[in-house]
UniProtKB/Swiss-Prot annotation:
Homodimer. Substrate binds at residue 111. This is tRNA pseudouridine synthase A. The active site is at 52 (nucleophile). The keyword tRNA processing applies. Keywords: Isomerase, tRNA processing. It comes from Rickettsia conorii (strain ATCC VR-613 / Malish 7).
Length: 245
């Protein structure tokens, strides 16, 4: 068997997320069907992360096995051809060792969350960023973010449906940068809880609106209660950027 590692980008707006589900179209299903069309083999695609409906990806990584060797550049061309008309594409493919696993071999995952912060919405960024018309206090958000860095119990920021065995995670990066009318939040960790990034963003926005003081983020974290945190930020602003191995 030959194991292939692919890097994928997609717009999640019209998709049901990464994972295959009955009755709806997912990224996993689109790619598995595309691979079958050119290889004749039913494969199971393993992704490095399971993005929700509406979440985008710039560098999602996945792997699959084929019984015969195909040149990686031909695999890229074939997948992109058969994945049409969906906004899903592969931009890298390479052979990987048989012990490589897109999910379990990962050492870190990187996300970006985009906020358009101006009085009027952006047509160009429709469904690709969270539009917030009220001015946000970015320095206050940056101050609050410091409390979340490091190893913590992130129960307050996990979805009620989260299936992770432990709420303990290590947030290695949480940078907030404002560029003109756009605010970007950069987050990285070895792994994340379900909705963890979006719940963190939703809480930091309350700080940015001066509804919360920066120090309240520490109280939310220590509460270990989802009800203590802010709302879940929209999926449209979230991008799965890359996975490190």
């Amino acid at each position: 068997m030959y194991r292939y590692k692919i890097t994928i980008e997609y717009l999640g707006t019209d998709l049901a997320g990464w994972q295959r589900q009955a009755g709806v179209m997912s990224v996993q299903q689109i790619l598995e069907e595309a691979i079958y069309k050119f290889s004749g083999e039913q494969v199971i695609l393993f992704g490095s992360g399971r993005t929700d409906a509406g979440v985008h990806a710039i560098g999602q990584v996945a792997h699959f096995d084929l019984s015969k060797y195909l040149e990686p550049h031909k695999i890229i061309t074939a997948i992109n051809y058969f994945a049409r008309p969906y906004a899903v594409g592969v931009w890298n493919c390479e052979l990987a060792p048989n012990n490589f696993h897109a999910r379990f071999s990962a050492t870190s995952r990187y996300y970006i969350y985009r906020i358009i912060n101006r009085p009027y919405p952006s047509v160009i960024d429709l469904n690709r960023a969270w539009w917030i018309s009220a001015p946000l206090d970015v320095p206050a958000m940056q101050q609050a973010a410091v409390y979340l860095l490091g190893k913590h119990d992130f129960t307050s920021f996990r979805a009620s449906s989260c299936q992770s065995k432990s709420p303990i995670k290590t947030l290695t990066e949480l940078n907030i940068i404002k560029e003109d009318e756009e605010i970007k939040l950069y987050l990285s960790a070895p792994s994340f809880l379900h909705h963890m990034v979006r719940n963190i963003v939703g809480s930091l926005v309350l700080v940015g609106k001066n509804i919360w003081q920066a120090e309240q983020i520490k109280d939310v974290l220590e509460a270990k209660d989802r009800k203590a945190a802010g709302p879940t930020a929209p999926a449209s602003g979230l991008y799965f950027v890359k996975t490190a191995y």
